[in-house]
């Protein structure tokens, strides 16, 4: 049975985020973990899945290729209130990643991200991956609060402006980022996902 058996991190409100990191191989079945993410988003998160994508950047081999054609998806982070799933993706993609494509195509959850427009374009152009129900939470915050600058803030700054929450835990990791180990980097990823869950909840209630 699939379980999030990675490190568990305590958030500032006393709750915990359970993590799972998967190096996706040709025989890796990620669908049970995606199902757990979807289930937690429905039960505990206003049907929202917080997503972040990470890229490997190369250079076009010929002049006919665009500047973005050398970008390839290297990993994906999916977060809910209680869970954080980090997928390291193979090159080239395997057939089992169709589960990820289907997950992103779901109409039953909202995929929430920060400054996501370029990522959405790259996913579609370079991988044929379409996120059907995606929301830029910074843009939503800017409209809700009447403050344009919120649309252009990163995760930390946006969470600070919307929630005014204690970011000391995240700041301490980022201050030593170059020396931080994999577990500390995973903790930072879990905190960022959890913060945006709370930003989404706050804006949804306004």
UniProtKB/Swiss-Prot annotation:
SUPFAM superfamilies, A to Z: Ribonuclease H-like
Superkingdom in the source lineage: Eukaryota
Main localization of the protein described in the UniProt heading: cytoplasm
GO annotation terms (biological process): positive regulation of miRNA metabolic process; regulatory ncRNA-mediated gene silencing
Tissue expression summary: Restricted to shoot and root apical meristems, trichomes, and vascular veins.
Enzyme kind, highest EC tier: hydrolase
Catalysed reactions, as listed in the record: Exonucleolytic cleavage in the 3'- to 5'-direction to yield nucleoside 5'-phosphates
Location in or out of the cell: Cytoplasm
Inactivation phenotype: Little effect on miRNAs levels. Plants lacking both RICE1 and RICE2 have reduced miRNAs levels and lower miRNA retained by AGO1, thus leading to the up-regulation of targeted mRNA transcripts.
EC number of the protein: 3.1.13.1
Annotated function: 3'-to-5' exoribonuclease (RNase) specifically targeting single-stranded RNAs. Triggers miRNA accumulation in RNA-induced silencing complex (RISC), composed of miRNAs and AGO proteins, by degrading uridylated cleavage fragments. Required during plant growth and development.
Oligomer and partners: Homohexamer with DnaQ-like exonuclease fold in a ring-shaped structure with a central cavity. Component of AGO1 and AGO10-centered RNA-induced silencing complexes (RISC). Interacts with and acts as a cofactor of AGO1 and AGO10.
Stated name of the protein: Protein RISC-INTERACTING CLEARING 3'-5' EXORIBONUCLEASE 2
């Amino acid at each position: 049975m699939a379980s999030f058996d990675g490190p568990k991190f305590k958030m500032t409100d006393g709750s915990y985020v359970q993590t799972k990191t998967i190096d996706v191989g040709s025989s890796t079945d990620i669908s049970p973990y995606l199902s757990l993410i979807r289930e937690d988003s429905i039960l505990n998160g206003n049907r929202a899945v917080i997503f972040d994508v990470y890229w490997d950047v190369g250079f076009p081999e010929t002049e006919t290729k665009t500047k973005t054609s050398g970008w390839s998806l290297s990993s994906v982070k999916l977060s809910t209130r209680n869970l954080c799933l980090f997928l390291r993706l193979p090159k080239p993609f395997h057939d089992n990643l169709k589960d990820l494509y289907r997950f992103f195509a779901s109409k039953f959850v909202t995929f929430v991200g920060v400054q996501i427009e370029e990522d959405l374009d790259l996913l579609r152009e370079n991988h044929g991956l379409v996120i059907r129900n995606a929301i830029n939470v910074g843009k939503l915050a800017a409209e809700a609060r009447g403050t344009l600058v919120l649309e252009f803030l990163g995760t930390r700054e946006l969470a600070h402006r919307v929630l005014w929450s204690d970011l000391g835990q995240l700041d301490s990791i980022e201050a030593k980022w170059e020396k931080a180990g994999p577990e500390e980097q995973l903790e930072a990823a879990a905190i960022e996902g959890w913060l945006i869950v709370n930003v989404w909840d706050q804006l949804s209630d306004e």
